[in-house]
A protein has these predicted regions:
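A short, flexible loop at the N-terminus of ABC-type nucleotide-binding domains that lies
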Residues: 1-7, 11-23, 71-73
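The feature captures the beta-strand-to-loop junction immediately N-terminal to the Walker
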Residues: 37-39
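Helix-to-loop junction immediately C-terminal to a conserved catalytic motif
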Residues: 52
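Conserved ABC transporter NBD signature motif
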Residues: 60-68, 77
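Conserved ABC ATPase "signature" region
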Residues: 113-131
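Conserved ABC ATPase signature
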Residues: 135-139
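Conserved ABC ATPase "signature" C-loop
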Residues: 213-214
Length: 274
């Protein structure tokens, strides 16, 4: 697979001496869906913010398409790396949803028909057409996050980071975001989700990066990660409930590393347990 972004021997120390990252090495491949997980303070967000220039390495480097990002501005990096904050209030400031989406498009040089096409596409995909002329900050936190995601999506960044995208979302909202990420990855976008939502991880990502105390402690598939109790305990994360249930039902012939309720239902039916 083509590598589109790398962290090489990356360390970051905040003012005051707190070392948030310790010699992290990570490569991201084109068209993949990745989750970065770990407890608060493990370094997830600090690592992610290096890829779009919001933070700069204390030591080490970030490569975007093989090019050192140290001399790139955040504006230049934004054309390659989109970032949706955990708190959408940090990136919403326009008077209307329409203007919010247009702002990013104008920043990357779009105008005229292409800008209009991207705007309409984003409004339709995220069901925002009825809200296009309303003030983004007047919405619930869940809808504000959708607006922020739509504004970044409209720019079609090759790499997209989403910090806690399911926070404040109901089940249909989570499903919509998940399906969008699948579509974008199939189109060649690289998707990175920073999250505590292990059900979302189980259903929508293919690779999981586990962090603890500023280091990557494991890199694997969701099944591999959830099956490693030592890593889960060190990272202070819990597998999806259905995964734990499958473990307890293994003696009845249930596959012990079931990831989703649909997989569980299929296992039960295949074994004639109901």
């Amino acid at each position: 697979m083509t590598i589109v972004a790398e962290a090489v021997d990356l360390s970051h120390t905040y003012p005051g001496g707190v070392q948030a990252l310790k010699n992290v090495n990570l490569s991201l491949s084109k068209g993949t869906r990745v989750a970065i997980v770990g407890q608060n303070g493990s370094g997830k967000t600090t690592l992610s913010k290096h890829f779009n220039g919001l933070l700069r390495p204390t030591t080490g480097k970030i490569l975007i398409n093989g090019i050192d990002a140290k001399n790139k501005t955040t504006g230049e990096l934004a054309q390659s790396v989109g970032y949706v904050f955990q708190n959408p209030n940090y990136q919403l400031f326009s008077k209307t949803v329409r203007e919010e989406i247009e702002f990013g498009l104008k920043n990357i040089g779009l105008q005229g028909e292409e800008l209009r096409k991207r705007l309409i596409e984003a409004l339709e995909i995220f069901d925002l057409k009825p809200l296009a002329n309303k003030q983004p900050l007047s919405f619930s936190s869940g809808i504000r996050k959708i607006v922020a995601l739509a504004s970044v999506y409209a720019m079609h960044p090759p790499i997209l980071f989403l910090d806690e995208p399911t926070t404040g979302q109901d089940h249909p909202g989570k499903e919509k975001i998940g399906q969008l990420l699948l579509t974008m990855a199939n189109e060649g976008h690289t998707i990175v989700v920073i999250t505590h939502d292990m059900n979302f991880v189980a259903k929508y990502v293919e690779r999981v990066i586990v962090m603890a105390q500023g280091e990557i402690i494991k890199d694997g598939t969701p099944r591999e990660i959830f099956s490693d109790y030592a890593v889960m305990e060190k990272a202070h994360i819990q597998p999806p409930q259905v995964f734990s249930l499958a473990r307890s039902l293994a003696s009845y012939g249930i596959q012990k590393d079931v990831l989703t309720p649909l997989e569980m239902a299929e296992n039960i039916l295949q074994r004639g347990l109901i």
